[in-house]
Design a protein with these regions (language model features):
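Short, solvent-exposed loop/turn segments at the edges of secondary structure
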Residues: 56-58, 119, 148
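N-terminal low-complexity, intrinsically disordered segments
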Residues: 1-47
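Long, positively charged amphipathic alpha-helical accessory segments at protein N-termini or as interdomain linkers
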Residues: 84-110, 137-234
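Short helix/loop capping segments that flank catalytic or ligand/cofactor-binding pockets
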Residues: 21-23, 30-32, 132-133, 157-158, ...
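Aromatic/basic-lined ligand-recognition segments
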Residues: 114-136
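Internal, conserved structured core segments that host functional sites
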Residues: 60-121
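Short acidic-glycine loop/turn motifs at beta-strand connectors
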Residues: 16, 56, 126-128, 143
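A glycine-rich, hydrophobic loop/mini-helix early in the fold
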Residues: 30-71, 204
């Protein structure tokens, strides 16, 4: 990844089979592993932080780039604005979250296990509801920093099924998590009232980066051996 960071790299992909990814430091014990296995839901750990996501009806994006002199939030903001421009081209008016929540307090609650139960600063929302969940990590390569940022763009409501795979035995807690996800998330299908055209969406997002960053992407195929590394990550 670091070797490719001389040129920014943008990828879009979907998950088959569906999978739950956990943040780098999140415990697998947060999940009901038996039920995940029975339903054919893979479990992976991301190299980035954050909380659990059920990768189902979504389009996942991944950006690898040199950080330069920019801070984590500056890079996050740059990528988010490009995504917002792409979503606008698709016909969706999204916005940035302006306030950073106190995650040290939020993570004490059992309802904090799902990523989409809260929005960080510069994450993308629609009418106050989280539409894109993202995470970033920096890797040191000699004297430079290389950024990996990836995220889930919700296309349908299947992400809410994550509640069924949590290691939560109290029905009241499970119900609260489900309610919070319902109230705090939005998906493109719900917003547009139509089935999301993934290829069209990816094309709009690609163009959004080009317009926001003043660049032109060069399309390249992904090496076959790369597809077998990291359980589909980044």
């Amino acid at each position: 990844m670091a070797q490719r960071a001389g040129t920014p790299t943008l990828r879009f992909f979907e998950w088959q089979p569906w999978a739950i990814s956990l943040g780098h430091h999140q415990k697998t014990s947060d999940l009901d592993e038996g039920r995940c296995k029975a339903d054919g839901i893979d479990i992976v750990h991301r190299p980035t932080g954050g909380r659990a996501i059920l990768h189902a009806e979504e389009l996942t994006y991944s950006v690898v780039m040199a950080a330069g002199r920019k801070s984590i939030l500056q890079v996050y903001n740059d990528i988010s604005r490009a995504l917002i421009r792409g979503l606008a081209l698709y016909g969706v008016d999204a916005a940035l979250q302006k306030v950073q929540p106190n995650f040290s307090e939020e993570y004490r609650s059992p309802s904090s296990v799902p990523c989409f139960n809260s929005s960080a600063r510069y994450e993308i929302e629609w009418e106050g509801r989280k539409l894109v969940g993202s995470a970033q990590r920096r890797f040191h390569e000699g004297e430079r920093d290389v950024v990996l940022q990836h995220g889930s763009i919700l296309c349908g409501p299947a992400h809410m099924r994550l509640v069924d795979y949590l290691a939560v035995t109290d029905p009241a807690v499970r119900g609260q998590v489900r309610l919070t996800l319902t109230e705090k998330t939005a998906d493109l299908g719900m917003i547009t009232g139509k089935t999301v055209e993934r290829e069209k969406l990816a094309a709009c997002l690609r163009r959004g980066f080009e317009e926001a960053w003043g660049i032109t992407w060069e399309e390249r195929s992904v090496p076959k051996n790369f597809m077998h590394k990291g359980a589909g990550l980044p």
